[in-house]
């Protein structure tokens, strides 16, 4: 179910403050965050945000095509290595 249009998109306050501060200084640096639920808004375009995936922070460069998506969509948490190999030969 999508978020109601009456409400604004969710962005963590600490993340929003860091973005605004960097925009006023016109500086670019990596912003570290654990807030995977935050929505990408147009003021974040051009920044690099390191998003936590449960083990490490993955740096993601924000482009205009990412606006409206959540930060967590761009840092995968599970590394699928394939199904277990069939070992019927070893059982015989």
Swiss-Prot record:
Keywords: Chloroplast, Plastid, Ribonucleoprotein, Ribosomal protein, RNA-binding, rRNA-binding. InterPro entries: Ribosomal_uS19 (IPR002222), Ribosomal_uS19_bac-type (IPR005732), Ribosomal_uS19_CS (IPR020934), Ribosomal_uS19_SF (IPR023575). Its main location: plastid. GO terms for cellular component: chloroplast; mitochondrial small ribosomal subunit. It is found in: Plastid, Chloroplast. GO terms for biological process: ribosomal small subunit assembly; translation. PROSITE patterns: RIBOSOMAL_S19. GO terms for molecular function: rRNA binding; structural constituent of ribosome. Belongs to the universal ribosomal protein uS19 family. Protein S19 forms a complex with S13 that binds strongly to the 16S ribosomal RNA. HAMAP family: Ribosomal_uS19. PANTHER family: RIBOSOMAL PROTEIN S19P FAMILY MEMBER, SMALL RIBOSOMAL SUBUNIT PROTEIN US19M. This is Small ribosomal subunit protein uS19c. It comes from Eucalyptus globulus subsp. globulus.
């Amino acid at each position: 179910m999508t978020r109601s249009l009456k409400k604004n998109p969710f962005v963590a306050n600490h993340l929003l403050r860091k973005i605004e501060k960097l925009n006023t200084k016109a500086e670019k640096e990596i912003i570290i965050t654990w807030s995977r639920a935050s929505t990408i808004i147009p003021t974040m375009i051009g920044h690099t945000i390191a998003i936590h995936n449960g083990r490490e922070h993955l740096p993601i460069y924000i482009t205009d095509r990412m606006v409206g998506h959540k930060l967590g969509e761009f840092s995968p948490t599970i590394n699928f290595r394939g199904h277990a190999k069939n070992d019927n030969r070893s059982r015989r």
